[in-house]
C-alpha cells in the first residue's frame, strides 16, 4: 500500500490545511504556552541523547496522526524484520544487519563471526598503537592512510575527526577517496613510507577510485625504497572479497573481512572502522559500538510516541510530503562534527533517493530531501541569510554538545548561545511593525529589509558530552531515521542502483579519452564535444 493510499492520509492532509498558516510565535506566546509547556511536551530522550521538537510546526494532534501513519505504513514490522536478519534488501536478496555489529548478545545474528573479526582487529590495532607492528626499516607506524570511497571513507573519516580528542597523538590518520590524483598527492607530501600503514577498504576490491589510489600508493612505496617483499608490513585490506585482496598483493594474514549483509554506508562498525580503532583504541571503539547499541535498543523498544528515530523520521516526512520542503539542513554546533553533514548526505540520499517502491511501482510522491550542512557558527556567515529571510522552507537539525571536549572552555558559552539563539530567531522572526520601530522615522524604507518571517522549523539535538558512546548513539539515530522514512515511502533504503549507470558509461568514456580514434556517433553531441576537448588537452 502506497503512502497516499493509507487510511490516515486524508486526515493528515486535512490537518495540514488546518495548521499550515499557524505561526510558532503564537504557540509559544505565554498565554498559550502553559504547563506543561511546548518544550516539556515535545522534548524526548533516548540512547543518551535529548531532542527538542517543540520548535517544529507540529501539535499534539500532528504527532498522533504521524504515529498512526507509521503504524499503518508498517514501520514496526520493517524495524523488527531488520533486527531479525530477514531479507529487508529484496533487490539484492540480502539482510541489513549493521545492528548485529554492535549487539552484545551471543544470540545476535552472526555473533561468532563478528566477535572473531573484532578480536582480530583489536590485536592488530593494539600492535600498531604500541609500536610492535613496524615498517620495513623497523620504525613504528606514525601515519595511517585509509583508502576508500563512499561508506569506506565518509564514516571512518567523520568518526576519527569527531573523536580526535581521545585519539592517540602518536599516529596521524589520513583519508584518500577521490580518483583525482591531487587527493593522494597531498597526503604523500606529508608521510614517510617507512612509517606509514595503508588500509585499503573496498567491499568488492574492484572499486575504480579505491583501486586506482591503492595501485598508485603501492608504486609510491616501492619507488621510495620499500622492497616489494616488505609491502606486507605496510598494506592491509578490508573487503567482502578476500580473493581479490590477495590478488592485489596483500598478504592473506592482512585481510580483514566485511560481509555482504552490511551495506557500505552502514559499515563503520565493522572492519571498515579499522582506522577508527587504531586511532582511538579497541576499548573506545567498543564504547562507540555500545552507544549505537543503546540507540538500537531505544529504537526497538520505546513507544513510537517517544521514539527518537521514529519522531525524527516522521517530522521529516511531514515537511517533505506536506509542506513541500526540498531540502533539510544539519547544523552541528561542534567543529568535531565537521564531517557529519557529508556523512549524512550519503546515509540519507543514497538510502532514500529512490523513485521505485519495493514492489517495483513508481512513487507519485517525494522521497528523500536534499541533505546539506556545515558546522556552526560557520554556516551563520554563509547561508543563514537565506534560512532567515529567503522564501524557501528549510527544516533544520541543530546539534549542540553541552560540554567542550577541548581546553578552550571560555569559547563554549559563545558557541551554545549562537546555536540556541539561531533556533529562537528562526522561530520568532521579526514583524514588520517591530522592523519599523528599529528602522525609525528617518529610514522607513529599511523596514521590509529588517523583517524576518520566522516560523522556520528546527529540531535541537542535545549531547551532554562528545564521547565515543554518545557519538555512536547519534549516528545510529540517523541510521534508524532513514529506515523509518523508507518504510513510510515503501522503498528499499539498502540498495543503490543509481550509482551504476554512471560507472558503466564512465568506463566507455575513459577508453575513448585515450583511444587512437573515437567515433563521434558513439555518444551524444555534448559528450562527444567534451571528450574531444579533453583529448586535445591530454595530447591525444
Swiss-Prot record:
Catalytic center residues: 350, 381, 503
Gene Ontology MF terms in the entry: carbohydrate derivative binding; glucose-6-phosphate isomerase activity; monosaccharide binding
Principal place of residence: cytoplasm
Catalytic activity: alpha-D-glucose 6-phosphate = beta-D-fructose 6-phosphate
Gene Ontology cellular component annotations, sorted alphabetically: cytosol
Metabolic or biological pathway: Carbohydrate biosynthesis; gluconeogenesis; Carbohydrate degradation; glycolysis; D-glyceraldehyde 3-phosphate and glycerone phosphate from D-glucose: step 2/4
GO biological process: gluconeogenesis; glucose 6-phosphate metabolic process; glycolytic process
Subcellular location: Cytoplasm
Enzyme class name: isomerase
Superkingdom of this protein's organism: Bacteria
Alphabetical keyword list: Cytoplasm, Gluconeogenesis, Glycolysis, Isomerase
EC number(s) stated in the UniProt entry for this protein: 5.3.1.9
Family: Belongs to the GPI family.
PANTHER family given in the database record: GLUCOSE-6-PHOSPHATE ISOMERASE
Role this protein plays: Catalyzes the reversible isomerization of glucose-6-phosphate to fructose-6-phosphate.
Protein name: Glucose-6-phosphate isomerase
Organism annotation: Burkholderia thailandensis (strain ATCC 700388 / DSM 13276 / CCUG 48851 / CIP 106301 / E264)
Gene, per the UniProt record: pgi
Amino acid at each position: 500500500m502506497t503512502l497516499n493510499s493509507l487510511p490516515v492520509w486524508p486526515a493528515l492532509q486535512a490537518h495540514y490545511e488546518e495548521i499550515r498558516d499557524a505561526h510558532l510565535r503564537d504557540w509559544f506566546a505565554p498565554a498559550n504556552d502553559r504547563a506543561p509547556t511546548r518544550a516539556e511536551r515535545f522534548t524526548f530522550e533516548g540512547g543518551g541523547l535529548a531532542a527538542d521538537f517543540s520548535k517544529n510546526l507540529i501539535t499534539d494532534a500532528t504527532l498522533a496522526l504521524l504515529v498512526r501513519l507509521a503504524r499503518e505504513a508498517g514501520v514496526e514490522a520493517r524495524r523488527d524484520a531488520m533486527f531479525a536478519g530477514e531479507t529487508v534488501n529484496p533487490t539484492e536478496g540480502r539482510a541489513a544487519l549493521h545492528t548485529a555489529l554492535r549487539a552484545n548478545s551471543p544470540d545476535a545474528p552472526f555473533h561468532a563471526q563478528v566477535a572473531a573479526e573484532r578480536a582480530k582487529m583489536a590485536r592488530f590495532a593494539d600492535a600498531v598503537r604500541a609500536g610492535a607492528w613496524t615498517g620495513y626499516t623497523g620504525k613504528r607506524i606514525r601515519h595511517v592512510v585509509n583508502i576508500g570511497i563512499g561508506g569506506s571513507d565518509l564514516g571512518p573519516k567523520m568518526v576519527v575527526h569527531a573523536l580526535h580528542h581521545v585519539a592517540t597523538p602518536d599516529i596521524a590518520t589520513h583519508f584518500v577517496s577521490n580518483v583525482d590524483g591531487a587527493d593522494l598527492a597531498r597526503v604523500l607530501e606529508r608521510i614517510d613510507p617507512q612509517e606509514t600503514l595503508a588500509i585499503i577498504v573496498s567491499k568488492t576490491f574492484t572499486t575504480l577510485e579505491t583501486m586506482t589510489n591503492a595501485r598508485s600508493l603501492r608504486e609510491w612505496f616501492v619507488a621510495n625504497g620499500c622492497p616489494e617483499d616488505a609491502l606486507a608490513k605496510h598494506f592491509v585490506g578490508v573487503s567482502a572479497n578476500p580473493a581479490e585482496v590477495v590478488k592485489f598483493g596483500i598478504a592473506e594474514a592482512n585481510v580483514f573481512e566485511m560481509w555482504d549483509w552490511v551495506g557500505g554506508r552502514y559499515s563503520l562498525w565493522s572492519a571498515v572502522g579499522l582506522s577508527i580503532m587504531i586511532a582511538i583504541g579497541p576499548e573506545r571503539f567498543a564504547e562507540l559500538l555500545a552507544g549505537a547499541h543503546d540507540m538500537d535498543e531505544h529504537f526497538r523498544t520505546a513507544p513510537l510516541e517517544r521514539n527518537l528515530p521514529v519522531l525524527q523520521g516522521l517530522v521529516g516526512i511531514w515537511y517533505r510530503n506536506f509542506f513541500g520542503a526540498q531540502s533539510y539542513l544539519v547544523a552541528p554546533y561542534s567543529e568535531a562534527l565537521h564531517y557529519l553533514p557529508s556523512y549524512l548526505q550519503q546515509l540519507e540520499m543514497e538510502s532514500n533517493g529512490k523513485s521505485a517502491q519495493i514492489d517495483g511501482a513508481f512513487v507519485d510522491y517525494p522521497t528523500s530531501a536534499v541533505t546539506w550542512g556545515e558546522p556552526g557558527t560557520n554556516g551563520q556567515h554563509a547561508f543563514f541569510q537565506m534560512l532567515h529571510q529567503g522564501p524557501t522552507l528549510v527544516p533544520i537539525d541543530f546539534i549542540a554538545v553541552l560540554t567542550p571536549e577541548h581546553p578552550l572552555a571560555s569559547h563554549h558559552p559563545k558557541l551554545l548561545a549562537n546555536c540556541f539563539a539561531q533556533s529562537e530567531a528562526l522561530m520568532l522572526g521579526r514583524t514588520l511593525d517591530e522592523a519599523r520601530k528599529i528602522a525609525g522615522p528617518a529610514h522607513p524604507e529599511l523596514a521590509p529589509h529588517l523583517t524576518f518571517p520566522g516560523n522556520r522549523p528546527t529540531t535541537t539535538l542535545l549531547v551532554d558530552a562528545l564521547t565515543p558512546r554518545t557519538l555512536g548513539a547519534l549516528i545510529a539515530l540517523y541510521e534508524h531515521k532513514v529506515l523509518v522514512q523508507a518504510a513510510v515511502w515503501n522503498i528499499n533504503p539498502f540498495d543503490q542502483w543509481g550509482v551504476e549507470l554512471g560507472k558503466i558509461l564512465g568506463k566507455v568514456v575513459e577508453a575513448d579519452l585515450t583511444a587512437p580514434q573515437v567515433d563521434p556517433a558513439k555518444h551524444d553531441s555534448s559528450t562527444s564535444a567534451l571528450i574531444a576537448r579533453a583529448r586535445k588537452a591530454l595530447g591525444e
